């Protein structure tokens, strides 16, 4: 019996394989002892006493969604093999000098096996900057994965790579088609738990985003899914204290790009005092002040993206706006919206003219020529990082590198002030 090639580089529980397949695989203990405690070998979670089964074994509840790991069973993996060497990059575009510098730095990072952080502003063109390093690894027979905590980021990157690379590309998320073996994989960070020493190069985008940030399980998945001599590259527009510390300690090399690809400055948010949003919302009405701003924006004809702090408020706002603006096509998306992918595409295609969203769309999506309003911008869910990312949706297009970015609030807080200050600093660093 031959090994199924789709199994190479993948990690399996005992029950996922036949007896014949298990005999062909390498074996790992499903759990290990660490300071007297049992720890899951797939997700690195400590096993609690209540996770005990009547059969006399423990199981891991943390990664249960990806099939049960039991202490009385093993984990199995099939060592990754090299791919045929191939020339895969179809993209013939031109990088800006700033992008070229980062691209060259990434090629050097591969040669020197130096883990690297790319800190680039929103709209800098991070995707194009990684093309050369991705192509280099694949051209040499290696395996590459681009991972992100957010499904929207994965979908956007996947579409871009399909256009610009000639090899097959596997897209993996909770609702995707089954995996097939290919030298280029796009996956949510949770999907990395299903790989073991599979990739020569792993690029993690949006490393400051939930659910990746401060998640030891996903940090472990990132470490475990890369070959022992493989390389990790991290991309972000809003760095974290932990990443900055690793740069200071020399554990990460930093490459910075403070300028957008079209050379125009980041849009500076404009804070707008709005104290009656909730009072009117509770009456199923729209604040007259907010309505006047929406009226003015709709006369421009540009699409409008409105961020709401909570799902319930977003749903209420959609109903109210639909009454107030009957000629507009309005949508709402959140983490629990079943047709959110379809609505996002409809907004991108111009079929929806106003889209209301929770922070689920704060990053990883591009809507040409869009204006952005944030209501209750001083809500605790809108962190400095979140507000910077939201602001990054505006002015991304060469056709319209400007746009309105309004933060409606009933009291300026630290997050708003720090977000504005950091955006101003990035423009200054870029010489703009």
Regions inferred by a protein language model and the residue ranges of each:
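Conserved segment of the helicase C-terminal RecA-like domain
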Residues: 227-242, 391-423
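Post-DEXD/H (motif II) to motif III coupling segment of the RecA-like Helicase ATP-binding lobe
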Residues: 197-275, 285, 292
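Walker A/P-loop
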Residues: 111-135
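Conserved RecA-like helicase motor core of SF1/SF2 enzymes
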Residues: 206-209, 344, 348-401, 409-414
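Interdomain "pre-motor" coupling segment immediately N-terminal to P-loop NTPase/helicase cores
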Residues: 30-82
């Amino acid at each position: 019996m031959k090994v199924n090639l789709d199994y190479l580089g993948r990690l399996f529980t005992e029950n996922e394989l036949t007896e014949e397949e298990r005999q062909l695989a390498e074996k790992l203990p499903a759990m290990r002892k660490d300071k007297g405690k049992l720890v899951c070998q797939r997700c690195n979670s400590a096993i609690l006493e209540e996770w005990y089964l009547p059969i006399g074994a423990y199981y891991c509840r943390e990664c249960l969604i990806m099939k049960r790991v039991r202490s009385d069973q093993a984990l199995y993996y099939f060592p990754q093999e090299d791919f045929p060497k191939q020339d895969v990059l179809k993209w013939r575009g031109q990088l800006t000098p700033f992008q070229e510098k980062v691209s060259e730095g990434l090629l050097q990072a591969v040669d020197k096996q130096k883990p690297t952080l790319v800190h680039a502003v929103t709209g800098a063109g991070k995707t194009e900057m990684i093309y050369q390093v991705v192509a280099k690894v694949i051209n040499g027979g290696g395996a590459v994965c681009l991972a992100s905590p957010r499904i929207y980021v994965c979908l956007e990157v996947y579409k871009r790579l399909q256009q610009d690379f000639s090899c097959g590309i596997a897209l993996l998320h909770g609702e995707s088609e089954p995996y097939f073996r290919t030298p280029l994989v796009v996956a949510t960070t949770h999907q990395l738990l299903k790989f073991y020493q599979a990739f020569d190069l792993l690029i993690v985008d949006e490393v400051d985003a939930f659910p990746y940030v401060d998640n030891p399980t996903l940090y472990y998945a990132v470490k475990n899914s890369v070959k022992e001599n493989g390389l990790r590259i991290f991309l972000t527009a809003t760095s974290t204290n932990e990443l900055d510390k690793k740069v200071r300690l020399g554990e990460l090399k930093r490459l910075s790009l403070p300028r957008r690809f079209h050379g125009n400055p980041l849009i500076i948010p404009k804070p707008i005092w709005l104290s009656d949003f909730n009072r009117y919302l509770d009456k199923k009405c729209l604040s007259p002040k907010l309505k006047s701003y929406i009226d003015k924006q709709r006369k421009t004809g540009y699409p409008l993206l409105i961020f709401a702090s909570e799902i319930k408020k977003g749903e209420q706002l959609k109903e109210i706006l639909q009454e107030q603006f009957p000629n507009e096509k309005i949508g709402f998306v959140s983490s629990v919206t079943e047709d959110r992918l379809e609505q996002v595409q409809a907004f991108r295609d111009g079929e929806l003219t106003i889209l209301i969203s929770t922070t689920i769309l704060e990053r990883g999506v591009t809507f040409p020529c869009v204006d952005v309003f944030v209501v209750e911008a001083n809500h605790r869910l809108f962190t400095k990082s979140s507000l910077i990312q939201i602001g990054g949706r505006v002015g991304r297009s060469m056709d319209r590198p400007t746009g309105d970015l309004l933060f409606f609030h009933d009291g300026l807080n630290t997050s708003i002030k720090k977000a504005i200050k950091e955006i101003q600093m990035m423009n200054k660093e870029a010489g703009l």
